[in-house]
């Protein structure tokens, strides 16, 4: 149904359209919004921020060119998704374009003001990294959303910080932009030229067309590494250079690993490199559990990668479980993290007991074994670290002033247990108290990063060249990479044929 505009007599124009409810039966009703402004432009559409009338609720409206002969896959998938950590589609409607027979699909979604990428870039400008407790909070919610998504057979295929919306007031993270998502069916081929380059799983680079949802786990590992490092872990300049960057860190894949990634791969010459110990990839103060979790996601063999919910059960997230009554800096409680639905409890029932909160004071945190801590990125045993080997391969680690010019200090609740391996160091001198997240993103312990860290993060924008945006937030619902356009068009991936009846 085409949109209709009505002038309400107010200063700002109110647009009224006939829209369809996103969930349940196709019930159509009039909705009205005002104060629409463009917050993002992408290869396949424009995103507006608007205010609903009369509720004043803020929404994001993603407008994409639609071919009426096809069903838009993004719409079909979003209508099936209901999860606390996935952006909610509220309504959809069609509108006419300037050209004859030009029709646009408009997706009306909930609005969140920030993205993980935007927050990450703020830290990079201040030569800081995101405090580890925010890494913990945000990565948990990302993995939980992926566990739900994958259980339905859907693969996101474009996991990256730009597609993770944040509300700093509530601490909520929501996965967005399902323009590249697809239901993967065993035996049916899919294009390999998908996913933004820096987060693209190696099996995709090696041309696999029968990949699984484990490509999303690789992307999540890249995101977590980026948050810990303050810069991209694999900053490839091209598709081929991307695998070179991966090999530099993880070593040359074995013939068995190549077969696991793509049984039909025709081998070309790769540089013969040995893998680095994970402890040398990250900074000395990076928590051992964080490094261990990354090592379980960034694995060449797709089936060896941890599942999303097993990732949520990892000891890195035990601090969330040990005290579920922690508070955000504004005094609010943490967002719901353990309100698993009856459906979620059936996804991996054996894992569920590991996901639930533990009694405060219980000693359930598992320290990664010494043997595992000393494995390299290929999972092989590495020599014990010497004093010299404890120096990080990346920029030197030090406390550094925040934007206000004052040294950043950690609240008492952010004391870290010294695991005795050089990766965890005690911060502060106060007794341990219930963990309280910092006053704001810049008020917590944060580590200095290299001078080029922001440029490294910026490359993800400039290189892809896929959007223009106002740093206002929800534009990220249309972050679709030009790096993927060709593949999307050739895949039959973005649309499904409309039923004739």
From Swiss-Prot:
Record: residues binding ATP: 39-47, 62
GO CC, alphabetical: cytoplasm
Residue ranges, annotated region (Disordered): 355-427, 446-501
The protein's enzyme class: transferase
EC number: 2.7.11.26
Active-site residues (renumbered): 158
Entry's Gene Ontology BP terms: male gamete generation
Keywords: ATP-binding, Kinase, Nucleotide-binding, Phosphoprotein, Serine/threonine-protein kinase, Transferase
GO molecular function: ATP binding; protein serine/threonine kinase activity
Domain Protein kinase: 33-317
SUPFAM superfamilies, A to Z: Protein kinase-like (PK-like) (SSF56112)
Post-translational modification: Phosphorylation on Tyr-193 is necessary for the activity.
Chain intervals with Basic and acidic residues compositional bias: 381-390
Composition-biased stretches (Acidic residues): 451-471, 482-501
Reactions catalysed according to its record: L-seryl-[tau protein] + ATP = O-phospho-L-seryl-[tau protein] + ADP + H(+); L-threonyl-[tau protein] + ATP = O-phospho-L-threonyl-[tau protein] + ADP + H(+)
Modification type Phosphotyrosine: residues: 193
Family: Belongs to the protein kinase superfamily. CMGC Ser/Thr protein kinase family. GSK-3 subfamily.
PANTHER family referenced in this protein's UniProt entry, alphabetically: GLYCOGEN SYNTHASE KINASE-3 ALPHA (PTHR24057), PROTEIN KINASE SHAGGY-RELATED (PTHR24057:SF0)
Protein name per the record: Putative glycogen synthase kinase-3 homolog
Organism: Drosophila melanogaster
Lineage, top ranks: Eukaryota, Metazoa, Ecdysozoa, Arthropoda, Hexapoda
Gene: gskt
């Amino acid at each position: 149904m085409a949109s209709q505009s009505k002038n309400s007599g107010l200063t700002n124009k109110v647009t009224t359209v006939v829209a369809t409810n996103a969930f349940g039966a196709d019930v159509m009703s009039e909705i009205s919004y005002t104060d629409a402004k463009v917050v993002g432009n992408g290869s396949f559409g424009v995103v507006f921020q608007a205010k609903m009338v009369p509720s004043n609720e803020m929404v994001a409206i993603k407008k994409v060119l639609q071919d009426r002969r096809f069903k838009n896959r993004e719409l079909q998938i979003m209508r099936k998704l209901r999860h606390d950590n996935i952006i909610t589609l509220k309504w959809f409607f069609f509108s006419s374009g300037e050209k004859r027979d030009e029709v646009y699909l408009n997706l009306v979604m909930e609005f969140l003001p920030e993205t993980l990428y935007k927050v990450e870039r703020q830290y990079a400008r201040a030569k800081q990294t995101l405090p580890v407790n925010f890494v913990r909070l945000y990565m948990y919610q990302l993995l939980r959303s992926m566990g739900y998504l994958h259980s339905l057979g859907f693969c996101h295929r474009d996991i990256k910080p730009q597609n993770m919306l944040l509300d700093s007031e509530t601490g909520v993270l929501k996965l967005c932009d399902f323009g590249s998502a697809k239901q993967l069916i065993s035996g049916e081929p899919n294009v390999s030229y998908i996913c933004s380059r820096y987060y693209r799983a190696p099996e995709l680079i090696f041309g696999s067309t029968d990949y699984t949802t484990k490509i999303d786990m690789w992307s999540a590992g890249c995101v977590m590494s980026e948050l810990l490092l303050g810069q991209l872990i694999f900053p490839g300049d091209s598709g081929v250079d991307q695998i070179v960057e991966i090999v530099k860190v993880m070593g040359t894949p074995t013939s068995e690993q190549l077969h696991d990634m793509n049984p039909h791969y025709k081998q070309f010459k790769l540089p013969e490199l040995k893998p680095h110990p994970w402890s040398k990839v990250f900074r000395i103060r990076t928590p051992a559990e964080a490094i261990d979790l990354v090592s379980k996601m960034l694995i060449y063999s797709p089936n060896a990668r941890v599942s999303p919910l097993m990732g949520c059960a990892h000891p890195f997230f035990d601090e969330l479980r040990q005290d579920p009554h922690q508070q955000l800096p504004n005094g609010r409680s943490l967002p719901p993290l353990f309100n698993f639905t009856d459906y979620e409890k059936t996804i991996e029932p054996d894992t569920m007991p590991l996901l639930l909160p533990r009694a405060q004071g219980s000693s359930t945190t598992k320290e990664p074994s010494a043997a595992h801590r000393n494995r390299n990125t290929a999972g092989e045993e590495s020599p014990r670290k010497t004093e010299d080997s404890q120096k990080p391969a990346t920029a030197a680690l030090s406390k550094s002033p925040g934007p206000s010019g004052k040294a950043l200090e950690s609240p008492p609740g952010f004391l870290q247990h010294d695991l005795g391996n050089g990766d965890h160091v005690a911060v502060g001198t106060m007794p341990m108290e219930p963990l309280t997240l910092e006053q704001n993103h810049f008020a917590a312990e944060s580590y200095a990063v290299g001078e080029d860290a922001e440029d490294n993060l910026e490359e993800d924008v400039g290189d892809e060249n896929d959007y223009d945006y106002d740093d206002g937030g929800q534009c990220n619902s249309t972050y679709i990479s030009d790096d993927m356009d060709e593949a999307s068009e050739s895949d039959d991936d973005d649309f499904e044929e409309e039923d004739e009846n």
